């Protein structure tokens, strides 16, 4: 074989070898499986999200706790009675200033209180009533500590209006709002009110002084 032919054959074999090597490399690259990092990334992302969530929840918890503390403190402080309220918890009344047969209205804890200096005739009238006929049966003696002094809350037991004294069909009090009539003992006798006028806590500190509350 001539040297020219030999070189040509050698070059051809070299080219084929190069082509085969390139083909093998290409096949190897095409079969290469890239590692899957998704789970790792997802885990990191999930952990980051959880950490952020924990941070936000913790922050909101602290803010909520602080807000709740302020609310509770404000709520409790609203129950702290002021000096004015404490001063009105009890009211002293000088009875010598109230003539017999007359009413006086005082204010106690924001409510009207009726004080009636009853006459002997009024006391007798109150005691002559048959309590079996009353809607809210009460003896007059159970409503007073001293027969001549009747002390009641001036609030109609129907819807809370203030009755008028020395009025009505029974010589006691009349509520103009819905027509309830109370007798000289403050007992309901006619109209929609279900109960007698309420008796507040009171005491006589001496013969001339009444303490309401």
Curated annotation (Swiss-Prot):
UniProt transit peptide range: 1-29
UniProt cofactor note: Binds 1 [2Fe-2S] cluster per subunit.
Top enzyme class: translocase
Enzyme Commission designation: 7.1.1.8
Membrane-spanning parts: 48-77
InterPro entries in the cross-refs: bc1_Rieske_TM_sf, Rieske_2Fe-2S, Rieske_2Fe-2S_sf, Rieske_Fe-S_prot, Rieske_Fe-S_prot_C, Rieske_TM, Ubiquinol_cyt_c_Rdtase_Fe-S-su
One annotated GO molecular function: oxidoreductase activity
Membrane topology (UniProt): Single-pass membrane protein
BP GO terms, sorted: mitochondrial electron transport, ubiquinol to cytochrome c
Keyword set includes Heme: no
Intrachain S-S bonds: 161-177
Membrane topology, Mitochondrial intermembrane segments: 78-213
Family of this protein: Belongs to the Rieske iron-sulfur protein family.
Function: Component of the ubiquinol-cytochrome c oxidoreductase, a multisubunit transmembrane complex that is part of the mitochondrial electron transport chain which drives oxidative phosphorylation. The complex plays an important role in the uptake of multiple carbon sources present in different host niches.
Name used for this protein in its record: Cytochrome b-c1 complex subunit Rieske, mitochondrial
